[in-house]
Curated annotation (Swiss-Prot):
InterPro entries: Cyt_c_oxidase_su5b (IPR002124), Cyt_c_oxidase_su5b_sf (IPR036972). Keywords: Membrane, Mitochondrion, Mitochondrion inner membrane. This is Cytochrome c oxidase subunit 5B liver, mitochondrial. It comes from Oncorhynchus mykiss. GO terms for cellular component: mitochondrial inner membrane; respiratory chain complex IV.
Length: 33
């Protein structure tokens, strides 16, 4: 959804990416957000 509200699917994907990056960095996912 370019320039619009992201769909639930896009939001979930973004959240999964954040969690994966946080896990790789050894940080708490909530600290990244």
């Amino acid at each position: 959804a370019v320039g619009g509200i992201p769909t639930d699917e896009e939001q979930a994907t973004g959240l999964e990416e954040i969690v994966m990056v946080a896990a790789q960095x050894g940080a708490d996912x909530y600290d990244v957000m």
